[in-house]
Amino acid sequence: MKISKRQQDIYEFIKSEVKEKGYPPSVREIGEAVGLASSSTVHGHLARLEGKGLIRRDPTKPRAIEILSLEDEAETPNVVNIPIIGKVTAGMPITAIENIDEYFPLPEYMAAGETNVFMLEIDGESMINAGILDGDKVIVRQESSAINGEIVVAMTDENEATCKRFYKEANHFRLQPENDALEPILLNNVTILGKVIGLYRDIR
């Protein structure tokens, strides 16, 4: 099957991203990888690849590019679908959301073989100095304890959840924001829901 050099580069980039990360790149990422500034040009190449049966796209979903002729399938990482439980604030505490909204396909190696991993969407800017931004989805491993300085999702006695850096001090627990403009939350009691072990950010 004859395809252009540019289309081959795009196809190989998509294939390598799927193998490495478990999910396809965005149109913007494809453009940056192959030196195309115009998203419409990237879409044109994707349409040609789709027309030749090399990929399949779902126009209703972002990043929905499926490789139809993936060689060396054994090298493709296994993916585990982890629940996105809801939003958790990185600013003021909000009531914890326990209903599962959707699932996210996480490469198995990122879950380290554990089944007690979930995602929460960050709402707020109090963790920006740690690189956790409003709208990010944090990957959380369920744990009931933490070491000072670890970033956790914690629940207070008022059944409110928040994402902060954890410190156990002499007479209280301190949930420290990573934003110089905000004050820490001091609590007599706190319940650790889990440790933040990673994050996902949509850069589109």
From Swiss-Prot:
Subunit annotation: Homodimer.
Gene Ontology terms describing biological process: DNA repair; DNA replication; negative regulation of DNA-templated transcription; proteolysis; SOS response
Catalytic reaction list: Hydrolysis of Ala-|-Gly bond in repressor LexA
DNA-binding stretch(es), residue numbering of this chain: 27-47
Family: Belongs to the peptidase S24 family.
Site (Cleavage): A90, G91
Cellular component terms per the entry's GO annotation: protein-DNA complex
A GO molecular-function descriptor: DNA-binding transcription repressor activity
Originating organism: Listeria monocytogenes serovar 1/2a (strain ATCC BAA-679 / EGD-e)
Keyword DNA damage tagged: yes
Enzyme Commission number(s): 3.4.21.88
Keywords: Autocatalytic cleavage, DNA damage, DNA repair, DNA replication, DNA-binding, Hydrolase, Repressor, SOS response, Transcription, Transcription regulation
Protein name, entry field: LexA repressor
Active site: S126, K164
